[in-house]
């Protein structure tokens, strides 16, 4: 009874003040010692089988609680939002993984739980599931391996052509370049659309908003711009090439499939990446897709190359973000959007930039698309994006149904920095066109009230009608800049003033065919020089005059 003797010796060794200890406490120490002795004696007498069963009992009774710093448990799940207890070390916008294999992103870091948005079907997650940190902020694969592919918002291939071969990854939420690495916009980004390249020119590194009601041709302008880059990407000059990223947000899958087919038919997919977060995808994926596409574009920008990104459209991204924010219990503001919805778009669009030569001289041009309701450009999201961008192309339903396509309202459309990037040849021929069209619109409003107009006003109306006809252009038929210059030259210099407006389109097609087949050297000179010299001017005048004489006859 060694254990009992030790306990008694300890009790006797206590000083007299230990008398204050109750008899119960002293008794309990003797009971504990006796139980320990009995347990040891029983273990000695038992066989191997009983020892293993006792050990099994102790193992099963062990504390199975997990480390709450790196993992957590789902408290509630619904509407694509999971509330998770634990994950104390998780970072904002860190990727987390659920036990079902689904990924999510931590957005709300609260004292007692973490709000996680789920990238996928939340029905695969149930309460009590374990969630673990990945330690990585959300990133996507980037590089030239993605060209010609269709990927989702996380960079996973969804075109059935196998996995993406890229080994380079980049965070989706990178900070925009500062002031020092940037340089002012100076190189043209040609869309191939006469009305845009002549009146609202876009430069490489610019952010130009395409805004209008549904079904007014917003996506058509974006697709024409991508198709027009084929003439540069087929060449060998890397400085002229423009890689394209098209981000489809909240669109129908059939629409995206149709778009990919159109680009494939035009042989434009070889220099294009399509990032798709369709209407059936979870709201967090629709929110994330523009940032993922932007990171893919930044890869080209930061490697001294040029890229164009189209966000179609940011209205749907804002709606997805509003849905997430309200479900995360963030306070709503105007139109129920959260207070940081301006920052949502500004931090995205500020990443489009023209870098200076010390930083590679690359560029990322952004063409965000915004859908308005009944032409209301004073709504919350349209005004936000208009204030962030460097100009806007405003499309009108009324013009669209009048047959003026692209339905660009020349008065409301503006490019704040693009004129510095416009080629000199286009500046020379289109310089007065915007003013003439503005005067035409002003006079046309009064002309319907009376017919007794002076000769100068009648001349203004006549010229305006013909220029409006001249700016019409078919879908998926972008034009080279030198072809645009030749056509606009004929209209602005007054050679078409006596031609019937209904014959303008026919004249344009015939004139272009004639110039391309008979005067290729002149077009090459305009393209190479980038300006119209006196010699070129005289040659153009001669060609237009001679062709018109034959055309009218």
Curated annotation (Swiss-Prot):
Gene3D superfamilies documented for this protein? 2.40.30.20, ATP synthase alpha/beta chain, C-terminal domain (1.20.150.20), P-loop containing nucleotide triphosphate hydrolases (3.40.50.300)
Q: What is its main location?
A: mitochondrion
Q: What is this protein called?
A: ATP synthase F(1) complex subunit alpha, mitochondrial
Where N6-acetyllysine occurs, the residues are: 123, 126, 132, 161, 167, 230, 239-240, 261, 305, 427, 434, 498, 506, 531, 539, 541
Q: Where does ATP bind?
A: 215, 217-220, 473, 475
Presence of keyword Iron: no
Name any one GO molecular function: ATP binding
What is the name of the gene encoding this protein? ATP5F1A
Cellular component (GO) terms are: mitochondrial inner membrane; plasma membrane; proton-transporting ATP synthase complex
């Amino acid at each position: 009874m060694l254990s009992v003797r030790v306990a008694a010796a300890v009790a006797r060794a206590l000083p007299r003040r230990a008398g204050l200890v109750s008899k119960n406490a002293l008794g309990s120490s003797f009971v504990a010692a006796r139980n320990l002795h009995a347990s040891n004696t029983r273990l000695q007498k038992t066989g191997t089988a009983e020892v293993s069963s006792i050990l099994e009992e102790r193992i099963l009774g062990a504390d199975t609680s997990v480390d709450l710093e790196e993992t957590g448990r789902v408290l509630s799940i619904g509407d694509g939002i999971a509330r998770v207890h634990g994950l104390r070390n998780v970072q904002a916008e860190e990727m987390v993984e659920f036990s079902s294999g689904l990924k999510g992103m931590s957005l709300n870091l609260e004292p007692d739980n973490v709000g996680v948005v789920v990238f996928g079907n939340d029905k695969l997650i149930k309460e009590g599931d374990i969630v673990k940190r990945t330690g990585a902020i959300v990133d996507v694969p980037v590089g030239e391996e993605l060209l010609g592919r269709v990927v989702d918002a996380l960079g996973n291939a969804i075109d059935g052509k196998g996995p993406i071969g890229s080994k380079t990854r980049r965070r989706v939420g990178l900070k925009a370049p500062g002031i020092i690495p940037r340089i002012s916009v100076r190189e043209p980004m040609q869309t191939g659309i006469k009305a845009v390249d002549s009146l609202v020119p876009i430069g490489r590194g610019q952010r130009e908003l395409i805004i209008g009601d549904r079904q007014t041709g917003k996506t058509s302008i974006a697709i024409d711009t991508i198709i027009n880059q084929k003439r540069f990407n087929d060449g060998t000059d890397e400085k002229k090439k423009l890689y394209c990223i098209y981000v489809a947000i909240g669109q129908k899958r059939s629409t995206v499939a149709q778009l990919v087919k159109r680009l494939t038919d035009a042989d434009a997919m070889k220099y294009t990446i399509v990032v798709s977060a369709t209407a059936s995808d979870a709201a967090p994926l629709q929110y994330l897709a523009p940032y993922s596409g932007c990171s893919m574009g930044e890869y080209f920008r930061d490697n001294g190359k040029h890229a164009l990104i189209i966000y179609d459209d940011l209205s749907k991204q804002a709606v997805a973000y509003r849905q997430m924010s309200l479900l995360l219990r963030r306070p709503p503001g105007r139109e129920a959007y959260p207070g940081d919805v301006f920052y949502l778009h500004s931090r995205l669009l500020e990443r489009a930039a023209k870098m200076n030569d010390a930083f590679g001289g690359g560029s990322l041009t952004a063409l965000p698309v915004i859908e308005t309701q009944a032409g209301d450009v004073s709504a919350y999201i349209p005004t936000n994006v208009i204030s962030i961008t460097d100009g806007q192309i405003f499309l009108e339903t009324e013009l669209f149904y009048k047959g003026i396509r692209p339905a660009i309202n020349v008065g409301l459309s503006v490019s704040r920095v693009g004129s510095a990037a416009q080629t000199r040849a286009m500046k020379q021929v289109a310089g007065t066109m915007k003013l003439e069209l503005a005067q035409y619109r002003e006079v046309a409003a009064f002309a319907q009230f009376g017919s007794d107009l002076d000769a100068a006003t009648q001349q203004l109306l006549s010229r305006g009608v013909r220029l409006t006809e001249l700016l019409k252009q078919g879908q998926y038929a972008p034009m080279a800049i030198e072809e645009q210059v030749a056509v606009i030259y004929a209209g602005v210099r007054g050679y078409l003033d006596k031609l019937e407006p209904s014959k303008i389109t026919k004249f344009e097609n015939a004139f272009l065919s004639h110039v391309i087949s008979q005067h290729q050297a002149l077009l090459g000179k305009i393209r190479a020089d980038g300006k119209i010299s006196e010699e070129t001017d005289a040659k153009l005048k001669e060609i237009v005059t001679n062709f018109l004489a034959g055309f009218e006859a």
